[in-house]
Amino acid sequence: MKIGRYTSGLHRGLLIALAACSSLSTGSLTIQAQAQHASGGGTYFVAPGMRSEFQFNQAHVQCKVGHGVMPDGTVMQMFMASTSIDSVSIDSAAKTVTITGSMVSIVELRFTDGTTARLTETVPYTAFAKDNSASGGADFFSLTVVYTDTPGLDQFDLFGSPATFAGDLVTGNVVIK
């Protein structure tokens, strides 16, 4: 009988200790997740009349121009999406994030003579975002990519290298915690 009571008391104590430890463990994971968060989405203008849409989080970055007309009349569509994330640096005090990695950059062109071209390249990138909500200012997003110059028509010819697509947000927001 004494052994039975001792054993059940031991089980009760062990359960209480396990419950206490698990709540401590869960608590610190929650705090860490809250302290390291960066995400955003919205639109900004990369050139007058040329709106860009972006989304990012700590696992993915993408940016696109759904429709744009270049100075020579060429119609352009662009889509860029990360294929890897190499680093994520969050500065919670400054409310900024810098994300680096590789992404695919695809540009569809329709020239004024009716011909078309599709340009595809995998490029290194650096995405940067700033959450300006505390100051009441517009949030900011930029995406810098490094294009390769090749003998034929390529994205280097269109945008140079490095090329930075950046602006204050017109819609959407950036959240850095």
Please tell me what each predicted stretch does.
Residues G136-D139:
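Extended soluble regions of mature proteins
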Residues Q32-A47:
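Boundary/junction segments of secreted and surface-exposed precursor proteins
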Residues Y147-K177:
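Edge beta-strand at a domain terminus
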Residues Y44-A129:
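Predominantly extracellular/secreted and cell-surface proteins with exposed
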Residues C21-Q32:
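C-terminal segment of classical bacterial N-terminal signal peptides
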Residues K2-A17, T26:
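Bacterial N-terminal signal peptides that target proteins for export
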Residues D131-S133:
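Short edge-strand/loop segments of extracellular domains
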